[in-house]
């Protein structure tokens, strides 16, 4: 599945036996539910049985739950959406979420895929949510990134 210029096709992944956590916000439910659906389709096609799914209200809550998931999962997928408003709040939330997820990933040595959309408009978010007519499926892309990175790390850690 390719969404546009420069977007690679999603790889075929076999993550059988991998413990995967997904944290998804509920704000802008149509978008977040679609992102979650895309991620779940990828985990299912990669033979991940029963990923742990945790829902939180907003994007700012995602990093702390991702941190808890990273403690006992091999891959974490973070999903949500922040849409620019008329105040600087957008910038603060986007920065906090991005830095928080990066810190969790590095501190836990666990891939945490950032599937939190940061858009100027709701239309841009809908176009990336994996809905019918959307140009991209960022939930699926985040899941593929988390799983493929976890497999890469398994390979690196398995070397003597």
From Swiss-Prot:
Q: Which UniProt keywords apply?
A: Riboflavin biosynthesis, Transferase
Residues that span the membrane, as ranges: none
The residues that hold (2S)-2-hydroxy-3-oxobutyl phosphate are 86-87, 128
Which GO biological process categories is it annotated with? riboflavin biosynthetic process
Q: Where does 5-amino-6-(D-ribitylamino)uracil bind?
A: 27, 59-61, 81-83, 114
Which GO CC annotations does the UniProt entry carry? cytosol; riboflavin synthase complex
Give the EC number(s) under which this enzyme is classified.
2.5.1.78
GO MF annotation list = 6,7-dimethyl-8-ribityllumazine synthase activity
Q: Which InterPro entries match?
A: LS, LS/RS, LS/RS_sf
- So where's the catalytic machinery, residue-wise? 89
Question: Which PANTHER family does this chain map to?
Answer: 6,7-DIMETHYL-8-RIBITYLLUMAZINE SYNTHASE, 6,7-DIMETHYL-8-RIBITYLLUMAZINE SYNTHASE DMRL SYNTHASE LUMAZINE SYNTHASE
Q: What does this protein do?
A: Catalyzes the formation of 6,7-dimethyl-8-ribityllumazine by condensation of 5-amino-6-(D-ribitylamino)uracil with 3,4-dihydroxy-2-butanone 4-phosphate. This is the penultimate step in the biosynthesis of riboflavin.
The subunit structure is: Homopentamer.
Its name, as the record gives it, is 6,7-dimethyl-8-ribityllumazine synthase
Organism from which the protein derives: Mycobacterium sp. (strain KMS)
């Amino acid at each position: 599945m390719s969404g546009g210029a420069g977007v690679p096709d999603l790889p075929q992944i076999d993550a059988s036996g991998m413990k995967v956590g997904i944290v998804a916000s509920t704000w802008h439910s149509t978008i977040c539910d679609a992102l979650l659906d895309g991620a779940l389709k990828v985990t299912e096609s990669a033979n991940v049985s029963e990923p742990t799914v945790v829902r939180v209200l907003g994007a700012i809550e995602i990093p702390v739950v991702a941190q808890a998931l990273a403690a006992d999962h091999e891959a974490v997928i973070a999903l949500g959406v922040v849409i620019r408003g008329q105040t600087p709040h957008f910038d603060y939330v986007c920065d906090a979420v991005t830095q928080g997820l990066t810190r969790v990933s590095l501190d836990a040595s666990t891939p945490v895929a950032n599937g939190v959309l940061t858009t100027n408009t709701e239309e841009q978010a809908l176009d990336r949510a994996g809905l019918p007519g959307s140009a991209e499926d960022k939930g699926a892309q985040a899941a593929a990134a988390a799983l493929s990175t976890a497999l890469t790390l398994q390979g690196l850690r398995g070397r003597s």
